[in-house]
């Protein structure tokens, strides 16, 4: 019985060690499709635009010195019209810490985050906004996935549910520079971006008019939708 107790304790110690090993986080991780990756292929800070991947997915990157970046591209169900799903793209970066209890806390650079919400079957515009969302993960675990035989990252959210598993794609990580990329000036600048249309669901095809809004106002996103093609007007 004593030996069994030590055996169980050893397993628990191994698990905690794996969960709390910050060095294991380092790299770029992506969900199964591996089409969504952090870095310049998802967000172009010079043109200030999000670049749509071929498939939906999630990606996180972490550095050894406490910086992170994330990229989301998701389809949102439309209960009132299942044939018209909405799409959302989100990008942000900032710093992270892991506390003594193994809790992972992500703090984004407030002015840099971006979100694009599109709905092809509703009104005449989509909304491109600043996006700022701190995140807390109760735990993380890195291990070799027995099926795919690659390193896997499991993130447990603040409500104890788990995100979709992510798999290691790059180490060192593929990321944009970790400093502020879009410092806010007192004067507003307007830019015009032309986009061609090819289909009815791809986000780049759904955007007719996009606006960078004050982050305090982005809760109104649900009131605005998207139509096909045209010019994009971005305010920063």
Curated annotation (Swiss-Prot):
Intervals, Lumenal compartment = 19-217
Topology in the membrane? Answer: Single-pass type I membrane protein
What GO cellular component is one of the record's annotations? endoplasmic reticulum membrane
Taxonomy of the source species: Eukaryota, Fungi, Dikarya, Ascomycota, Pezizomycotina
Subcellular location field: Endoplasmic reticulum membrane
Q: Where is the signal peptide?
A: 1-18
Question: InterPro entries, alphabetically?
Answer: Rot1
Q: Which residues cross the membrane?
A: 218-235
Query: One GO molecular-function annotation for this sequence?
Result: unfolded protein binding
Q: Which GO terms describe its biological process?
A: 'de novo' protein folding
What is the annotated role of this protein in its UniProt record? Required for normal levels of the cell wall 1,6-beta-glucan. Involved in a protein folding machinery chaperoning proteins acting in various physiological processes including cell wall synthesis and lysis of autophagic bodies.
Classify the main location. endoplasmic reticulum
- The entry's protein name is Protein rot1
Q: Which residues lie on this side of the membrane: Cytoplasmic?
A: 236
Stated family:
Belongs to the ROT1 family.
* Positions annotated as glycosylated: 54, 132
Q: Which UniProt keywords apply?
A: Endoplasmic reticulum, Glycoprotein, Membrane, Signal, Transmembrane, Transmembrane helix
An example of a Pfam family matching this protein is Rot1
């Amino acid at each position: 019985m004593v030996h069994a107790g030590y055996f169980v304790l050893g397993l628990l110690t191994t698990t905690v060690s794996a969960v709390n090993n910050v060095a294991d986080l380092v790299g770029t991780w992506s969900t199964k499709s591996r089409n969504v990756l952090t870095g310049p292929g998802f967000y172009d800070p010079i043109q200030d635009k999000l670049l749509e991947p071929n498939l939906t997915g999630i990606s996180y990157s972490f550095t050894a010195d406490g910086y992170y970046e994330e990229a989301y591209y998701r389809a949102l169900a439309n209960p009132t019209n299942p044939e018209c799903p909405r799409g959302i793209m989100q990008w942000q970066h900032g710093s992270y810490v892991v506390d003594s209890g193994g809790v992972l806390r992500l703090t984004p650079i407030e002015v840099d985050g971006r979100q694009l919400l599109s709905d092809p079957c509703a009104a005449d515009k989509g909304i491109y906004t600043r996006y700022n969302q701190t995140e807390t993960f109760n735990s993380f675990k890195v291990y070799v996935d027995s099926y795919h035989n690659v390193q896997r990252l499991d993130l447990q959210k603040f409500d104890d549910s788990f995100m979709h598993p992510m798999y290691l794609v790059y180490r060192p990580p593929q990321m944009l520079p970790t400093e502020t990329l879009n410092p806010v000036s007192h004067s507003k600048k307007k830019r015009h971006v032309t986009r061609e249309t090819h289909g009815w669901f791809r986000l780049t095809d759904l955007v007719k008019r996009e606006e960078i809004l004050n982050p305090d106002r982005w809760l109104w996103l649900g009131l605005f939708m998207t139509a096909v093609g045209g010019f994009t007007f971005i305010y920063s």
